[in-house]
Amino acid sequence: MQKKSSSKSHRATRGPSQRQLRAGELIRRALSDVVTRGTIQDPDLIERSFSVTEVRVSPDLRHATCFVAPLGKGDAAALAAALTRVRGYLRGQLSKEVTFKYMPDLTFEPDTSFDKAEQIDRLLHSPKVSQDLSPQDDEE
């Protein structure tokens, strides 16, 4: 008879659960709604356009990491720092929008996925890689 692997080690190899994904999407949408209302009084966030691109929630739903990206050119790290300053206010507003047993503690991080995608795109279009991807005439 084989032993079952522990759920913790099995969970570590898999991605987030359906519950985590659903909670993250609810928080992302509600956070976007709160931000678009324009009720945040922080001087670094007034008249600033940005997007909440993703929210990752811990398995116990007590912590949420919100990834933010400025629209247009801007400093994503400064944006994340400004949102961190008003996270108490945002958490309170979120509690009015979504119902959880415990409202997750919010952490804001700059979203670097767009930068990584741009870097990969530049690499794929570089002359060295292009010559490897183009068909050779002598192979036909």
From Swiss-Prot:
Description of how the protein assembles with itself and partners: Monomer. Binds 30S ribosomal subunits, but not 50S ribosomal subunits or 70S ribosomes.
Single GO BP term: maturation of SSU-rRNA
Family, similarity comment: Belongs to the RbfA family.
GO terms assigned for molecular function: ribosomal small subunit binding
Keyword check for Glycosyltransferase: no
A Pfam family this chain is assigned to: RBFA
UniProt keywords, alphabetically: Cytoplasm, Ribosome biogenesis
Gene: rbfA
Protein's UniProt name: Ribosome-binding factor A
InterPro entries linked to this entry: KH_dom-like_a/b (IPR015946), RbfA (IPR000238), RbfA_dom_sf (IPR023799)
Biological role stated in the UniProt entry: One of several proteins that assist in the late maturation steps of the functional core of the 30S ribosomal subunit. Associates with free 30S ribosomal subunits (but not with 30S subunits that are part of 70S ribosomes or polysomes). Required for efficient processing of 16S rRNA. May interact with the 5'-terminal helix region of 16S rRNA.
HAMAP family per UniProt: RbfA
Protein localization: Cytoplasm
Major subcellular location class: cytoplasm
Compositionally biased intervals (Basic residues): 1-13
GO cellular component, one term: cytosol
SUPFAM superfamilies the UniProt entry points to: Ribosome-binding factor A, RbfA (SSF89919)
TM annotation in the entry: none
Region (Disordered) location: 1-22
Database matches in PANTHER family: RIBOSOME-BINDING FACTOR A, CHLOROPLASTIC-RELATED (PTHR33515:SF1)
